[in-house]
Amino acid sequence: MLVHIGYGNSVLREHVVGVIRNDGAAIRRYRSMLKDSHKLIDATCGHKARSILIMASDHIILSAIAPETLEKRFE
């Protein structure tokens, strides 16, 4: 089942491991590490990233939708 993550982007529900808030130093370090290894996908369309989706393939996807809203969509 596809879940809308904002601005015309969707992900497969079965491939998402977790949704976390985009704040904190540890998250910034993790983002920069994955950006260097080409495993970061920006789905914000230029807007501020509010949440991070962690995928089963070790990729992370940045979303402009709040984590609480995404959690409701995954239910």
What is each PLM-predicted segment?
Residues 13-21:
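Phosphoinositide-dependent membrane-docking surfaces
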Residues 45-50:
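A short, compositionally biased
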Residues 51-75:
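C-terminal structural segments of small proteins and small subunits
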